């Protein structure tokens, strides 16, 4: 499974996972602005934030099935477009209810990234590489957590939370295009028959 495509593929999926962590953490950072904008209590803010987690959790089994039937390229591209739509709607949300719906869309949209990425990386990297590449994926996701803390606070203070999320929505649209352009479900040399080692890893939950 040697290909010049696999590292660009990995980095696109890794940035996708970075965005997952960013969206997971960001409401806590912009909480004061959201409370002021929508005139809500801390409890209501928790409801708004939880919309992401509920939709994310509910979709884990469906996205696994879709990754098998559609493939990672189609699945992650489609769901990223949904996440981008959610971020853009959140940025222009006129009411608390609208903002909550937008957060549900974001959670729905980013739910496919991790499962689909593990599946595809198992096919593109050897068994000896898989543990290392999975760890690197998680590490890049951690950068998303960091970027949604202090850096996000500075950006929000400079441009406002609405402009910040408009930017995130736009960035997600670009990322969807990159995913479609770069990601391939199966390495070229395995397009007719998957290797026995890759199939074994998939059947054992992605373990090398």
Residue ranges and their predicted role:
Residues 137-185:
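Helix-loop-helix hairpin linking two adjacent transmembrane segments in secondary transporters
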Residues 25, 53-61, 145-146:
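Residue-level signature of mid-helix packing/kink "hotspots" within the transmembrane helices
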Residues 58-97:
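Conserved MFS/SLC helix-loop-helix module at the cytosolic interface between two early adjacent transmembrane helices
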Residues 21, 25, 107-115, 146:
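Small-residue-rich segments within alpha-helical transmembrane domains of MFS-like 12-TM solute carriers
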Residues 8-42, 63:
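Extracytoplasmic
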Residues 181-207:
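Flexible cytoplasmic inter-helical loops of multi-pass small-molecule transporters
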Residues 102-141:
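Cytoplasmic helix-loop-helix junction between adjacent transmembrane helices
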């Amino acid at each position: 499974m040697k290909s010049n495509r696999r590292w660009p593929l990995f980095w696109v999926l890794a940035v996708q996972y970075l965005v997952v962590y960013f969206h997971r953490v960001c409401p806590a950072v912009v909480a004061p602005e959201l409370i002021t904008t929508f005139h809500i209590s801390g409890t209501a803010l928790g409801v708004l934030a939880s919309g992401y987690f509920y939709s994310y959790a509910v979709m884990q089994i469906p996205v696994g099935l879709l990754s098998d039937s559609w493939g990672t390229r189609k699945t992650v591209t489609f769901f990223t477009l949904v996440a981008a739509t959610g971020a853009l709607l959140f940025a222009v949300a006129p009411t608390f209810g609208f903002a909550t719906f937008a957060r549900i869309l974001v959670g729905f949209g980013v739910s496919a990234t991790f499962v689909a990425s593990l599946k595809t990386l198992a096919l593109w990297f050897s068994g000896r590489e898989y543990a290392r590449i999975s760890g690197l994926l998680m590490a890049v996701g951690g950068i998303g957590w960091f970027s949604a803390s202090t850096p996000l606070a500075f950006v929000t203070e400079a441009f406002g939370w609405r402009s910040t999320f408009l930017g995130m929505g736009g960035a997600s649209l670009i990322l969807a295009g990159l995913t479609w352009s770069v990601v391939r479900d199966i390495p070229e040399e395995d397009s007719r028959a998957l290797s026995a080692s890759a199939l074994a890893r998939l059947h054992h939950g992605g373990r090398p």
